[in-house]
Amino acid sequence: QHYLNGYPSKAYQLFEKALKDYEIANEIISLMQIQIPKNSSFFRTQKNHTPNVRKYEDFTTNMHNPLDLFHPKFQHRRFVPSNRFSISGYPSLYISENLQTSYSESFPNDESGSFHVVCFKNIRPLYFIDLSQKKLFRNKFLFEGVLPKKGKSSSFDVAGFLDNFGAYQLILASHIKMQYKKSDEREKLNFKAEYIIPQLLLQWIKQQNLAVDGIRYYSCTAANKYPGIKNYYNYTLPVRQSLQKGYCPSLCSLFSSCEVYSYFNNRLTASQLKKIELELNNSKFKFLA
């Protein structure tokens, strides 16, 4: 409420106090960290906004440099919108664990279209605050409803849930997806209330100087669009340095990348996306920095 009343600093102070008073901060630091091994694959897609380009081909390469699909350039801050974990004007790198998840972020619901895609691989292990949280306890009830579906034999670990109740509240708050009614299809949403708490969380992580690279969380769109896939994880990595132009050297030093592929088939199936993912994984990779 402080945030909506125009007091973002008060909102952060209250958020920080709640994490401390309810011992959620300790849960985040001790239970909610995950290591991703080096040479893991991450994907980032971007809608193709160039009309009538290479219609006679299904795909091409070299239309873009890999950095074109990295975080927004510092000199383009004015174009950076508010995202789930990052405030307007603050560049962050958003990547996905598989191509289907990344594609669904560019084309939510039943949308589809031509796009550019790149695969990044991390040069060293990466460390994240894990908001997907299969680790806290094994039941998947958090994203499937509290009661097990009919026919399931899995039991509900009430004790495990209560032990980490504060952490689960934070996880739920970070995954809310609200439906907004647009007066016009061309209307652009510049503010989403469900982003307030995730953005406060990222601010808190930066303020604590935790030895993590970012946050891992479930993709709300991929879970709906491709229910058959398992690991629909997204990752956000905030920039470590704020420069006048270019890209964050610290983030660039973490990754190698393949060349950018551009696809013009507007109706790709999940299996076709999986095939593209394998092709990207087997491509040649070069260091970003």
Question: How should each PLM-predicted stretch be described?
Answer:
Residues 1-78, 109-110, 115-289:
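Active-site and NAD+-binding cores of ADP-ribose-processing enzymes
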Residues 84-90:
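Short glycine-enriched loop/turn motifs at secondary-structure junctions
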Residues 90-96:
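Short, well-ordered beta-strand elements within core beta-sheets of diverse protein domains
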Residues 96-97, 117:
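Glycine-rich, histidine-containing beta strand-loop boundary motifs that form or position
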Residues 99-111:
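Short active-site loop/helix that positions an aromatic residue
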